[in-house]
Amino acid sequence: MNRVFKKILPGTMLGLGIMFWGASAQAYKVFVSNEKDNTISVIDSDSFKVIKTVEVGQRPRGIILSKDKRYLYICASDDDHVEVMDTETYKIIDTLPSGPDPELFILHPDGVRLYIANEDDNMVTVVNVNTGQVLVEIPVGVEPEGMAVSPDGKTIVNTSETTNMAHFIDTETLEITDNVLVDSRPRFAEYTDDGKFIWVSSEVGGTVSVISNKTRKVVRKITFHVPGVRNEALQPVGVRVTHDLKTAFIALGPANRVAVVDTQTFEVKKYLLVGQRVWQLAFDAEEKYLYTSNGVSNDISVIDVEDLKVIKSIAVGRYPWGVAVK
């Protein structure tokens, strides 16, 4: 039996009822990690308001949902472990081991293997979320952060900030098969849904590299220019690509913008003004809205994906870092 389920009372199923956007879309929750407050903010999608603030471990950063959306995994970076929160009761029900200073992670499509980037020991820790067992630690570059998994589950990509590389890891052999050099301080990696490309953001380099999964070579490099904004403020971090593979959204950090990129031409179509130091991004299930965590203005921006407009700002805790949508 899953070790997490042992700690849950039987019959604790969703009891909030079903609410709708207009005539179709089902209501959901948005989870935000607040790095300075040591909390998770829970936002209701109907009201766009915070309905719960949950105290968690020290310096929560990366967050990700379990495959069934029942649990939220939280990188408690200064506690050197991963916490598990029940998304219905909002209680921390378990902790999982990691290395020192876990920052980001990715869950394998099997829903069992969690790959954790530990910034302080240059390792990726692989944990079985059902047993809490460390399966292996994989040496990577210096200051690992970004994590992505191919749709077929065969490859993990880790980015190392100081080594300036994307490391391709075979999930069967658990060995690095390829190292791809990118620009300075790669912070995030995102596979496209067809598994053909990986988008890697380089914060200090100011670029996003598009890497072919087949050749393991950079095939395009995207740069940014916002009138009136200093080039050194254009610091790409979070990246999300739509399921139809037509559009990419890129958080530009202290530029306070999200770049909208045509994935066919690799040209920037638009810059959307959001909160201060925009960091991570998350779509809702239907990709109607994109949520951005804005670390310095302490809020979340809501972007209408079809209209490419910012429609709402939601105040959360101090230094919001990660965002995930149930």
Annotate the PLM regions.
Residues G15-I18, A23-K326:
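Predominantly soluble domains enriched in secretory-pathway, periplasmic, or organellar proteins
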Residues N2-T12:
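Bacterial N-terminal signal peptides that target proteins for export
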